[in-house]
């Protein structure tokens, strides 16, 4: 019999963004540095809202262990010594783009769609389901994405292991192993009823699809200069 965790993983992996054509090109060194930076700019806009979703859920969840995890995760992301958004910006600057252009850059339609979906998720769905979509459908993907990109950054883009410019990707391999494990544990603990489990699996699947579509927008913009899907 398939376990609840196995069903969650399967729902995520049907549209795991690590398999997206954009990341396939990056892993093979077939994107320019500027094209990789364009992903990071959109990721900046996505992550900025993801942090707000976590803060909102922390205000809604009644369980201390879940609140603690959310605040720990937020603390890691917003560490004043080296914010993760600043790590992203440093990579963009290393690709010869301007630091001030990151926050003020255009938000692609696909990125905005993911942002808006996330707010509907946290406002309208039970907190257990929202966290399943966030922790498993979205956040847990990034570990495998970074495992795919880091070797390429070393081999094809000239960054030495441990280089400050790519610390966002390297550090997420360790951090997301910890976060991913705790995220799964929370969802398994608080989605004990069959109905909640079914909702959680569907939410994870939906989150993965939403992230894939967001990647589609980045692909068309980075490779073809298209800001939306106008024919």
Residue ranges and their predicted role:
Residues 1-231:
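Non-heme di-metal
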């Amino acid at each position: 019999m398939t376990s609840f965790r196995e069903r969650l993983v399967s729902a995520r992996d049907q549209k795991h963004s690590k398999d997206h054509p954009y990341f396939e090109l990056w892993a093979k060194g077939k994107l320019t540095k500027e094209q990789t930076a364009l992903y990071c700019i959109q990721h900046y806009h996505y992550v900025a809202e993801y942090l707000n979703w976590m803060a909102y859920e922390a205000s809604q969840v009644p369980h201390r262990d879940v609140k603690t995890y959310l605040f720990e995760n937020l603390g890691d992301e917003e560490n004043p010594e080296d914010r993760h958004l600043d790590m992203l910006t440093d990579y963009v600057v290393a690709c010869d783009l301007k630091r001030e252009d990151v926050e003020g850059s255009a938000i692609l339609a696909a990125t905005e769609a993911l942002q808006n979906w996330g707010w509907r998720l946290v406002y309208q769905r039970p907190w257990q389901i929202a966290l399943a979509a966030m922790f498993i459908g979205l956040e847990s993907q990034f570990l495998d994405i970074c495992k795919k990109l880091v070797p390429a950054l070393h081999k094809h883009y000239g960054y030495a292991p441990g280089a400050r410019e790519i610390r966002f990707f390297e550090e997420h391999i360790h951090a997301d192993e910890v976060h991913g494990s705790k995220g799964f544990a929370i969802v398994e603990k608080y989605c004990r009823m069959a109905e909640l489990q079914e909702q959680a699996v569907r939410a994870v699947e939906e989150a993965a699809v939403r992230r894939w579509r967001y990647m589609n927008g980045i692909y068309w913009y980075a490779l073809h200069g298209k800001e939306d899907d106008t024919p």
